[in-house]
């Protein structure tokens, strides 16, 4: 793993109304969007950024999001396409803990876990309008206990093996891999900048901007905790991309996702 490689793990898709994707702008109607995780193979280890959604959880709690997910799009299945198992991942980083970004955390009791220091407390005690976003609590025994949802925990999940290192601000995760603080969508949201020896950097907006249109128009999703911070974060992402000459990749943009490399293909 001397050269940095980035794999996008296809996690299936979900549906939202257009007015939720593009807050107060639309147009309305069903918008099917991708969900994916980011695997970084690096000289310092294997880093997994986000873990997608759990199909059974969505069908139980948010069936109106109409999940489509095949076996190879689960976290174990997607890793299996690369000849890997969950135990091969060294570090799991969660950009935030909305259900479509943490559904596979339960497969990594052994891994070091990192998130913004405000995210676990927020999942324990979300705002009334955040309860569905923070509805899959299988990532944290602490959060599940706080919300009376311990039935969600995979057998063997404990506080000891589901504890996170809390960070704040922009943080170097590894050489050439940087977490970019972009609050607004959630209280402690992170975007991701990855640099490579032989190609331009990639800046993953994650949910700071669902789509290319979102970033170009500074139109955030309807799911947020601080819309002013969200707009400022989008401006920060745009400037970082310009300053670094980075390629932008979006979290929930189906048109762009169709052009991304997935499966065994990689960036590096």
UniProtKB/Swiss-Prot annotation:
Optimum temperature is 60-70 degrees Celsius. Stable for 10 minutes at 50 degrees Celsius or lower, 64% of activity remains following 10 minutes incubation at 55 degrees Celsius and 14% of activity remains following 10 minutes incubation at 60 degrees Celsius. Pathway: Cofactor degradation; B6 vitamer degradation; 4-pyridoxate from pyridoxal: step 2/2. Inhibited by Hg(2+). The active site is at 100 (proton donor/acceptor). Optimum pH is 7.5. Retains 36% of maximum activity at pH 5.0 and 10% of maximum activity at pH 9.5. Zn(2+) 1 binds at residues 96, 98, 185, 207. It catalyses: 4-pyridoxolactone + H2O = 4-pyridoxate + H(+). The keyword Hydrolase applies. Zn(2+) 2 binds at residues 100-101, 207, 252. It comes from the Bacteria. Keywords: Hydrolase, Metal-binding, Zinc. It holds the Pfam family Lactamase_B. Its cofactor is Zn(2+). It is an enzyme of class 3 (hydrolase). Binds 2 Zn(2+) ions per subunit. GO terms for molecular function: 4-pyridoxolactonase activity; metal ion binding. Its EC number is 3.1.1.27. CDD domains: AHL_lactonase_MBL-fold. GO terms for biological process: vitamin B6 catabolic process. Belongs to the metallo-beta-lactamase superfamily. Homodimer. Involved in the degradation of pyridoxine or pyridoxamine (free, phosphate-unbound, forms of vitamin B6). Hydrolyzes 4-pyridoxolactone to 4-pyridoxic acid. Has lower activity toward N-hexanoyl-D,L-homoserine lactone, but is not active toward 5-pyridoxolactone and gamma-butyrolactone. This is 4-pyridoxolactonase. It comes from Mesorhizobium japonicum (strain LMG 29417 / CECT 9101 / MAFF 303099). The lineage of its organism: Bacteria, Pseudomonadati, Pseudomonadota, Alphaproteobacteria, Hyphomicrobiales.
